[in-house]
Amino acid sequence: MRPYYIAIVGSGPSAFFAAASLLKAADTTEDLDMAVDMLEMLPTPWGLVRSGVAPDHPKIKSISKQFEKTAEDPRFRFFGNVVVGEHVQPGELSERYDAVIYAVGAQSDRMLNIPGEDLPGSIAAVDFVGWYNAHPHFEQVSPDLSGARAVVIGNGNVALDVARILLTDPDVLARTDIADHALESLRPRGIQEVVIVGRRGPLQAAFTTLELRELADLDGVDVVIDPAELDGITDEDAAAVGKVCKQNIKVLRGYADREPRPGHRRMVFRFLTSPIEIKGKRKVERIVLGRNELVSDGSGRVAAKDTGEREELPAQLVVRSVGYRGVPTPGLPFDDQSGTIPNVGGRINGSPNEYVVGWIKRGPTGVIGTNKKDAQDTVDTLIKNLGNAKEGAECKSFPEDHADQVADWLAARQPKLVTSAHWQVIDAFERAAGEPHGRPRVKLASLAELLRIGLG
């Protein structure tokens, strides 16, 4: 019996979790064999683990060791630098595989939709994070970090990452895998204050406690919260929201009780505040902030309502971190409102053999580990459908050398195709470059350099 040929488009956590689930199912199920091909638009795998997780969070990045173990399986192949929708089309993949899983994530950002948002100095967190993580698509972002104050819009972990990177001592960052160009820009330490702005209150903030607590470890940085921001919030209020919220409020109160120290840089939290307008002649110079109040919608949820109160704050950099958003893949359905591919249980609506996992399936929610169960759920649906196809004599017929034919086809469509062997060359090069400096790796930040090293 031939193996089932499965393609996975994307190579982030949800993609690798799906691959691991497929291979495990083959190991534990009689008469079930799998051959998994992973297609990635970049020459490098791991998705946001490589290009999204902050460089000063190496423990989170260590999950890549699990991915490496999956990639070592002889039933697994990696093909990088191939763009689905450009080099190959979804319909062509569906013809050549028994099933195709799309794990393409949420590659865009949500806009603020306010005047001045397009001024130089106003950028999306997805761009800024990609820039300091050496994602080749964001090499040219080059934000101006010479100003004294930055404003980060958003109350999630990504907003904390951005603020922390802006204020962390560059000598500390120099021991991480941060992009060299980002380290060079951060070295002058021009930014003295980062203001984190959230439209709702502390009870509604989406930070995780670990991320919030570690801010206390920033050398030479004060975390500043006006005690009035926490007035009226009881332990019972926080506990009613959840355990994480209760812990967060405790941490925030600790920061609010501290006295700022002279000469320290500042990370300032502002709640119940929304951006109204970004001002400047040729670049960001000021931001207009509006004060909000919380109102109930009658169903137990609260929303931020503008009070009409305004404040103008000098700022030279504005980073919007109000959420990621999926983008359409040519040839696949797309729900523009949610930024996801419509599906039922992971199976794409109207398709017999196409599936989704991760953020493109459910939206940009949860942490890396959330994708594990999400991927397993989709794989369970996929395997069940494969069994139904087999029983109904709908199983595809492929020649014995089908895997070789697919590899040749991909190489013909993309002559600069990156294989697992090529990626291993890139990986070894980056690690070797970092070793003399006590860094885990020095990332290659341009597509041209990645291909030059990988392909030789």
From Swiss-Prot:
UniProt-listed InterPro entries: FAD/NAD-bd_sf, FAD/NAD-binding_dom, Ferredox_Rdtase, Ferredox_Rdtase_adrenod
Record-level GO cellular component terms: peptidoglycan-based cell wall
Record field: catalytic activity: 2 reduced [2Fe-2S]-[ferredoxin] + NADP(+) + H(+) = 2 oxidized [2Fe-2S]-[ferredoxin] + NADPH
Broad EC category: oxidoreductase
Signal peptide start-end: none
Binding site residues for NADP(+): 110, 155-158, 199-200, 211, 366
Subunit structure: Monomer.
Family affiliation: Belongs to the ferredoxin--NADP reductase type 1 family.
Protein name: NADPH-ferredoxin reductase FprA
Phylogenetic classification of the source organism: Bacteria, Bacillati, Actinomycetota, Actinomycetes, Mycobacteriales
Gene: fprA
